[in-house]
Amino acid sequence: MNINATLIGQAIWFALFVFFCMKFVWPPISRALDERKQKIAEGLSAADRAERDLELAQEKATANLKESKEKAAEIIDQANRRANQIVEEAKDAARAEGERLIAKAHSEIDQEVNQAREQLRKDVAVLALSGAEKVLGGEVNQDKHTQLLEQLAAEL
C-alpha cells in the first residue's frame, strides 16, 4: 500500500472532522439523548407512582364500600328492630286498651245488674205491700210500711 499525500490529507481531514464532531456536534446530541433518557425514566417513574396510587385508591374504595355496606346493614337491622319494637308496643297498647274496655264493660254490666236488682227489690216490695194491703183489707201505716220495705229489701 502506498501512502501518498491524498491519504494523509484525507486522514487529517477525517481527524479534523472527528474533532469538530466531538467538539460541536456530539455534545448537543449527547445532551438530547440524556434529556430523552431522563424524560423516559421520569415517565416510567410517574407510571409506577400512578399504578401504586391507583392500587391504593382501589383499596380505599373497596374498604369504603365494605364499610358502607356494613353501616347500611346495621341501619337496616336497627330499623327492623325499631319496627318490631313499635309493632310490639302497638300490640301491647291495643291489648291494654282492650282489657280496659272489657273491664269497663264488666263494671257497667255489674252496675246495671245491681241497679236492676235494686229496682226489682223495690218493685217486689211495693207489689208485696199492695197485695198484703188488699188481703188485709186495710192500709198499713207509713212507719210500718217503711219498716216492712226495708226488711223485705234486706231479705231479698
From Swiss-Prot:
InterPro entries (UniProt xref): ATP_synth_B-like_membr_sf (IPR028987), ATP_synth_b/b'su_bac/chlpt (IPR002146), ATP_synth_F0_bsu_bac (IPR005864), ATP_synthase_B_chain (IPR050059)
One Gene Ontology molecular-function label: proton-transporting ATP synthase activity, rotational mechanism
Gene3D superfamilies with a match to the protein in the record: F1F0 ATP synthase subunit B, membrane domain
Keyword line: ATP synthesis, Cell inner membrane, Cell membrane, CF(0), Hydrogen ion transport, Ion transport, Membrane, Transmembrane, Transmembrane helix, Transport
Pfam families, alphabetized: ATP-synt_B
Transmembrane segments: 7-27
Topology in membrane: Single-pass membrane protein
Main localisation: membrane
One GO term describing the cellular component: proton-transporting ATP synthase complex
Highest taxon listed in the record's lineage: Bacteria
Ranges in coiled-coil conformation: none
Places the protein is found: Cell inner membrane
Subunit structure, interactors included: F-type ATPases have 2 components, F(1) - the catalytic core - and F(0) - the membrane proton channel. F(1) has five subunits: alpha(3), beta(3), gamma(1), delta(1), epsilon(1). F(0) has three main subunits: a(1), b(2) and c(10-14). The alpha and beta chains form an alternating ring which encloses part of the gamma chain. F(1) is attached to F(0) by a central stalk formed by the gamma and epsilon chains, while a peripheral stalk is formed by the delta and b chains.
Function: F(1)F(0) ATP synthase produces ATP from ADP in the presence of a proton or sodium gradient. F-type ATPases consist of two structural domains, F(1) containing the extramembraneous catalytic core and F(0) containing the membrane proton channel, linked together by a central stalk and a peripheral stalk. During catalysis, ATP synthesis in the catalytic domain of F(1) is coupled via a rotary mechanism of the central stalk subunits to proton translocation. Component of the F(0) channel, it forms part of the peripheral stalk, linking F(1) to F(0).
Family membership noted in the UniProt record: Belongs to the ATPase B chain family.
Official protein name in the record: ATP synthase subunit b
The organism of origin for this protein: Alcanivorax borkumensis (strain ATCC 700651 / DSM 11573 / NCIMB 13689 / SK2)
Gene: atpF
